[in-house]
Protein backbone atom coordinates (compact mmCIF):
# COMPACT_ATOMS: atom_id res chain seq x y z
CA UNK A 1 0.00 0.00 0.00
CA UNK A 2 1.34 3.41 -0.98
CA UNK A 3 1.72 6.26 1.44
CA UNK A 4 -1.29 8.53 1.78
CA UNK A 5 -0.87 12.18 0.85
CA UNK A 6 -2.36 15.21 2.56
CA UNK A 7 -5.55 16.36 0.84
CA UNK A 8 -5.37 20.09 1.64
CA UNK A 9 -3.89 21.13 -1.73
CA UNK A 10 -6.42 19.07 -3.67
CA UNK A 11 -9.28 20.52 -1.62
CA UNK A 12 -8.03 24.06 -2.27
CA UNK A 13 -7.74 23.36 -6.00
CA UNK A 14 -11.20 21.81 -6.04
CA UNK A 15 -12.70 24.83 -4.28
CA UNK A 16 -11.19 27.02 -6.97
CA UNK A 17 -12.68 24.94 -9.78
CA UNK A 18 -16.13 25.01 -8.18
CA UNK A 19 -15.80 28.78 -7.83
CA UNK A 20 -14.86 29.23 -11.48
CA UNK A 21 -17.77 27.02 -12.58
CA UNK A 22 -20.41 29.06 -10.77
CA UNK A 23 -18.82 32.27 -12.06
CA UNK A 24 -19.03 31.09 -15.67
CA UNK A 25 -22.75 30.39 -15.27
CA UNK A 26 -23.59 34.08 -14.74
CA UNK A 27 -21.53 35.19 -17.74
CA UNK A 28 -24.16 33.82 -20.13
CA UNK A 29 -26.68 36.47 -19.03
CA UNK A 30 -26.32 39.52 -21.24
CA UNK A 31 -27.55 43.04 -20.55
CA UNK A 32 -30.42 43.74 -22.99
CA UNK A 33 -29.88 46.51 -25.54
CA UNK A 34 -33.03 48.48 -26.34
CA UNK A 35 -31.58 51.43 -28.21
CA UNK A 36 -31.63 55.10 -27.36
CA UNK A 37 -34.88 56.95 -26.76
CA UNK A 38 -36.89 53.86 -25.72
CA UNK A 39 -38.97 54.09 -22.55
CA UNK A 40 -38.54 52.06 -19.37
CA UNK A 41 -41.35 49.67 -20.24
CA UNK A 42 -39.32 48.32 -23.14
CA UNK A 43 -36.42 47.59 -20.81
CA UNK A 44 -38.75 45.87 -18.34
CA UNK A 45 -40.11 43.65 -21.09
CA UNK A 46 -36.58 42.85 -22.23
CA UNK A 47 -35.61 41.90 -18.68
CA UNK A 48 -38.69 39.71 -18.26
CA UNK A 49 -37.78 37.88 -21.45
CA UNK A 50 -34.57 36.82 -19.74
CA UNK A 51 -36.43 34.71 -17.17
CA UNK A 52 -35.21 31.38 -18.65
CA UNK A 53 -31.63 32.59 -18.22
CA UNK A 54 -32.17 33.54 -14.58
CA UNK A 55 -34.01 30.28 -13.91
CA UNK A 56 -31.15 28.26 -15.38
CA UNK A 57 -28.68 30.34 -13.38
CA UNK A 58 -30.44 29.64 -10.07
CA UNK A 59 -30.90 25.93 -10.83
CA UNK A 60 -27.27 25.37 -11.73
CA UNK A 61 -25.83 27.58 -9.00
CA UNK A 62 -27.77 25.85 -6.23
CA UNK A 63 -26.95 22.40 -7.61
CA UNK A 64 -23.22 23.12 -7.92
CA UNK A 65 -23.18 24.79 -4.50
CA UNK A 66 -24.75 21.77 -2.80
CA UNK A 67 -22.39 19.45 -4.68
CA UNK A 68 -19.46 21.54 -3.44
CA UNK A 69 -20.75 21.04 0.12
CA UNK A 70 -21.00 17.28 -0.44
CA UNK A 71 -17.49 17.26 -1.89
CA UNK A 72 -16.35 18.94 1.33
CA UNK A 73 -18.16 16.31 3.42
CA UNK A 74 -16.44 13.49 1.54
CA UNK A 75 -12.95 14.88 2.00
CA UNK A 76 -13.53 15.55 5.70
CA UNK A 77 -13.99 11.80 6.10
CA UNK A 78 -10.52 11.02 4.75
CA UNK A 79 -7.16 10.63 6.47
CA UNK A 80 -5.41 11.29 3.17
CA UNK A 81 -5.58 10.66 -0.56
CA UNK A 82 -3.90 8.48 -3.16
CA UNK A 83 -3.63 8.49 -6.96
CA UNK A 84 -7.02 6.85 -7.46
CA UNK A 85 -8.78 9.55 -5.47
CA UNK A 86 -6.84 12.26 -7.31
CA UNK A 87 -7.91 10.89 -10.71
CA UNK A 88 -11.54 10.41 -9.66
CA UNK A 89 -11.59 13.91 -8.20
CA UNK A 90 -10.18 15.28 -11.44
CA UNK A 91 -13.05 13.68 -13.35
CA UNK A 92 -15.58 15.27 -10.98
CA UNK A 93 -14.00 18.69 -11.50
CA UNK A 94 -13.90 18.29 -15.29
CA UNK A 95 -17.63 17.60 -15.38
CA UNK A 96 -18.41 20.41 -12.94
CA UNK A 97 -16.60 22.80 -15.29
CA UNK A 98 -18.95 21.68 -18.08
CA UNK A 99 -22.12 22.70 -16.19
CA UNK A 100 -22.26 26.24 -17.71
CA UNK A 101 -22.76 24.79 -21.22
CA UNK A 102 -26.04 22.89 -20.66
CA UNK A 103 -27.14 25.76 -18.42
CA UNK A 104 -26.77 28.07 -21.42
CA UNK A 105 -28.70 25.59 -23.58
CA UNK A 106 -31.63 25.57 -21.17
CA UNK A 107 -31.58 29.36 -20.95
CA UNK A 108 -31.62 29.69 -24.74
CA UNK A 109 -34.09 26.98 -25.72
CA UNK A 110 -36.40 26.37 -22.72
CA UNK A 111 -39.30 28.20 -24.39
CA UNK A 112 -38.62 26.85 -27.89
CA UNK A 113 -39.44 23.58 -29.70
CA UNK A 114 -35.89 22.45 -28.89
CA UNK A 115 -36.55 22.53 -25.14
CA UNK A 116 -36.61 18.73 -24.88
CA UNK A 117 -33.10 18.41 -26.29
CA UNK A 118 -31.73 21.20 -24.11
CA UNK A 119 -33.26 19.74 -20.94
CA UNK A 120 -32.10 16.23 -21.85
CA UNK A 121 -28.52 17.45 -22.27
CA UNK A 122 -28.78 19.30 -18.94
CA UNK A 123 -30.02 16.21 -17.08
CA UNK A 124 -27.59 13.90 -18.86
CA UNK A 125 -24.60 15.95 -17.74
CA UNK A 126 -25.68 15.53 -14.14
CA UNK A 127 -25.87 11.78 -14.71
CA UNK A 128 -22.17 11.96 -15.52
CA UNK A 129 -21.43 14.25 -12.58
CA UNK A 130 -23.29 11.90 -10.24
CA UNK A 131 -21.45 8.88 -11.66
CA UNK A 132 -18.13 10.67 -11.13
CA UNK A 133 -19.05 11.33 -7.50
CA UNK A 134 -19.84 7.62 -7.10
CA UNK A 135 -16.40 6.75 -8.51
CA UNK A 136 -14.79 9.25 -6.14
CA UNK A 137 -16.65 7.90 -3.13
CA UNK A 138 -15.86 4.26 -3.97
CA UNK A 139 -12.20 5.17 -4.48
CA UNK A 140 -12.19 6.86 -1.08
CA UNK A 141 -13.99 4.13 0.84
CA UNK A 142 -12.53 0.99 -0.73
CA UNK A 143 -11.06 -1.20 2.02
CA UNK A 144 -11.59 1.65 4.50
CA UNK A 145 -7.87 2.43 4.47
CA UNK A 146 -8.29 6.14 3.78
CA UNK A 147 -11.22 6.76 6.11
CA UNK A 148 -10.86 8.34 9.51
CA UNK A 149 -11.53 5.88 12.37
CA UNK A 150 -14.68 7.74 13.47
CA UNK A 151 -16.42 7.29 10.12
CA UNK A 152 -18.90 4.46 10.63
CA UNK A 153 -19.95 1.86 8.04
CA UNK A 154 -23.50 3.14 8.44
CA UNK A 155 -22.44 6.61 7.32
CA UNK A 156 -20.53 5.21 4.34
CA UNK A 157 -23.53 3.13 3.29
CA UNK A 158 -25.85 6.11 3.71
CA UNK A 159 -23.77 8.26 1.36
CA UNK A 160 -23.46 5.40 -1.14
CA UNK A 161 -27.22 4.85 -1.15
CA UNK A 162 -27.88 8.56 -1.61
CA UNK A 163 -25.51 8.73 -4.59
CA UNK A 164 -27.19 5.81 -6.35
CA UNK A 165 -30.66 7.23 -5.72
CA UNK A 166 -29.53 10.51 -7.25
CA UNK A 167 -28.12 8.70 -10.28
CA UNK A 168 -31.42 6.90 -10.85
CA UNK A 169 -33.43 10.12 -10.58
CA UNK A 170 -31.19 11.92 -13.08
CA UNK A 171 -31.69 9.05 -15.54
CA UNK A 172 -35.45 9.39 -15.10
CA UNK A 173 -35.21 13.17 -15.56
CA UNK A 174 -33.32 12.70 -18.82
CA UNK A 175 -35.98 10.35 -20.19
CA UNK A 176 -38.78 12.67 -19.04
CA UNK A 177 -37.07 15.59 -20.82
CA UNK A 178 -38.08 14.18 -24.22
CA UNK A 179 -41.74 14.17 -23.18
CA UNK A 180 -42.12 17.03 -20.68
CA UNK A 181 -39.03 19.28 -20.63
CA UNK A 182 -40.27 21.53 -17.82
CA UNK A 183 -41.02 18.52 -15.62
CA UNK A 184 -37.50 17.26 -16.21
CA UNK A 185 -36.11 20.50 -14.77
CA UNK A 186 -38.44 20.18 -11.77
CA UNK A 187 -37.23 16.62 -11.16
CA UNK A 188 -33.61 17.81 -11.19
CA UNK A 189 -34.52 20.61 -8.78
CA UNK A 190 -36.25 18.15 -6.43
CA UNK A 191 -32.88 16.47 -5.94
CA UNK A 192 -31.80 19.52 -3.94
CA UNK A 193 -33.58 17.89 -1.00
CA UNK A 194 -31.58 14.69 -1.40
CA UNK A 195 -28.23 16.43 -1.88
CA UNK A 196 -28.99 18.92 0.89
CA UNK A 197 -29.64 16.09 3.33
CA UNK A 198 -26.38 14.45 2.31
CA UNK A 199 -24.50 17.71 2.87
CA UNK A 200 -25.86 18.28 6.37
CA UNK A 201 -26.21 14.71 7.61
CA UNK A 202 -24.32 13.84 10.79
CA UNK A 203 -22.48 10.61 11.38
CA UNK A 204 -21.97 8.79 14.67
CA UNK A 205 -18.25 8.19 15.33
CA UNK A 206 -17.03 4.87 16.61
CA UNK A 207 -14.73 4.30 19.53
CA UNK A 208 -11.83 2.29 18.06
CA UNK A 209 -11.47 0.34 21.34
CA UNK A 210 -14.99 -0.83 22.02
CA UNK A 211 -16.92 0.28 18.92
CA UNK A 212 -19.43 2.10 21.09
CA UNK A 213 -21.25 5.07 19.64
CA UNK A 214 -20.47 8.58 20.75
CA UNK A 215 -22.08 11.94 20.21
CA UNK A 216 -23.04 13.02 16.75
CA UNK A 217 -20.41 14.97 14.86
CA UNK A 218 -21.03 16.54 11.48
CA UNK A 219 -18.27 15.68 8.98
CA UNK A 220 -18.55 19.19 7.55
CA UNK A 221 -17.58 20.58 10.94
CA UNK A 222 -14.23 18.89 10.86
Enumerate the language-model features and the residues they cover.
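Multi-pass alpha-helical transmembrane bundle typical of ion/small-solute transporters
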Residues: 1-222
